[in-house]
Amino acid sequence: MFKLNKKTLDKHPKVQIWWTITTIRFKFEKEQRLGLIPQREGQYEKNKNVLTSATVKVNHYSSKQGQTQSASKAAVAVKANKAAGDSTTTSSQTPSVEAKKVEVTKQSFVQALRKVGFTGNNPLHFNMKLGNSSLSANGVDYYNAVKQALTELGTCW
């Protein structure tokens, strides 16, 4: 892994794209997590990093404690098999994943945030709580991800 700085970004423009696409994870309920990977496609205002509209794709997955425990047991079994000279491997079950594309506008995002208790003025820089954990954001990708998260969770429509 390497550190991102202005020189790196100037020399390697592709690095900047990967750097801005971020994964957000937060605890939703006792046994569920929501993983978000936004894709930026849309119209930007000139000279501003503000998205007026966009299409976002989000991966929503649910994982339960039982699956995590079975994954650790599987890892222990694999180590035991390797120690015994057995070449067979076991794989754990992966959580279910759903992907969805949704049209987003700045105004609908602000309205969604207000419905869940956001009182700030700037939608691109905020701190809000969902369930037991907090989610902080600053930037276009987080803007899309949080709007989509609210839609997926059914808290705004």
Swiss-Prot record:
InterPro entries the UniProt entry points to: DUF5396 (IPR035158)
Lineage per the UniProt record: Bacteria, Bacillati, Mycoplasmatota, Mycoplasmoidales, Mycoplasmoidaceae
Protein name, UniProt field: Uncharacterized protein MPN_458
Pfam families per record: DUF5396 (PF17374)
Protein family per UniProt: To M.pneumoniae MPN_456 and M.genitalium MG321 central region.
